[in-house]
Design a protein with these regions (language model features):
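N-terminal nicking endonuclease/strand-transfer module with a His-rich metal-binding environment
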Residues: 1-290
């Protein structure tokens, strides 16, 4: 029979405090079964502030990423287990492995068809002692928060310091860090692959029937993955139709394997009939068919 695949997704969080309050709030979540924190709200406030300061200092374009979030879908059998225990186990597994702070919540969607964990984690760790930088001479910052070399660069024609610019006098603190820099491993594809393996294994630990075990989806396999339909997705009908076509292909691939057709042959058909045709169609119509 066709393997069931685990679903684990990662998101970037530009507003970690807002996201924490959203996933952990009974008022905003219809089916919230448990929440778990490894650090208090002061930690997250400080993290958000320092991330924004660092981002401003770097002068990088785009959005500041304050933290990241994993979404882990759990098989329906998990609804029979004690929610707080499940959430604690899954969150502590992450903290033990990566040594970072987390906040998590266990939810069901509205129709109670998708039992899942939201796990927010910090990419920075607290320093043993705050790193405080004291100005050995006057330090100047322009309107964007960028450090400049001379007072002249932030002085208007009237001889006054321009609005929004700052001067830190000698002996004053001009920068302080409570956290390390971001751990870059969380950005990479290898991390997502690893965490999918880790959580798929953990999910399977609590499922006694091997037939029900989940597998990490292998994009080089004969099967096509289903697409997830998010809340209030305007393309819901399109995605449902697309998923039905994918299931049809997966059933056909199953039948072909059972009838003795080699995996290599099926992969060849998948490549020519699906991937190549889809990319031609995308080039000509700009549609996402796969």
């Amino acid at each position: 029979c066709m393997p069931r695949h685990s679903f684990i997704q990662i998101k970037e969080l530009p507003n970690v405090k807002g996201r924490i309050s959203y996933i952990t709030s009974h008022a905003r979540q219809e089916n919230l079964y448990a929440t778990y924190r490894t650090a208090d709200s002061t930690f997250w406030s400080n993290l958000a502030r320092e991330s924004q300061q660092e981002f401003q200092r770097s002068g990088t374009e785009g959005k500041c990423i304050e933290a990241r979030e994993l979404i882990i879908a759990l098989p329906e059998i998990y609804t029979q287990y004690e929610p707080q225990q499940v959430l604690t186990d899954f969150t502590e597994e992450f903290r033990r492995r990566y040594g970072v702070e987390c906040v998590s919540a266990l939810h069901h969607n509205k129709r109670k068809t998708n039992y899942h964990i939201h796990l927010i984690f910090s990419e920075r760790r607290l320093l043993p002692e705050p790193d405080v930088k004291v100005a050995s001479r006057s330090v100047f910052f322009d309107e964007t928060g960028k450090r400049v070399r001379t007072k002249k660069e932030i002085t208007g024609e009237d001889g006054q310091i321009r609005k929004g610019c700052t001067v830190i006098k000698k002996g004053e603190v001009y920068e302080s860090h409570l956290f390390t820099t971001k751990d870059t491993r969380f950005k990479g594809e290898p991390f997502l692959r690893e965490i999918k393996e880790v959580y798929t294994e953990l999910i399977n630990c609590h499922i006694s029937d091997p037939e029900q075990h989940l597998k990490v989806f292998d994009k080089n396999s004969v099967y096509l993955p289903a697409k997830k339909i998010g809340k209030n997705n305007p393309k819901e009908d399109e995605i449902k139709a697309d998923n039905a076509a994918r299931q049809e292909w997966n059933r056909t691939a199953d039948m072909a394997l059972l009838s003795g057709i080699s995996e290599a042959k099926i992969l060849e058909v998948k490549q020519t009939e699906i991937h190549e045709k889809a990319s031609q169609s995308i080039k000509s119509k700009g549609l996402s068919l796969i």
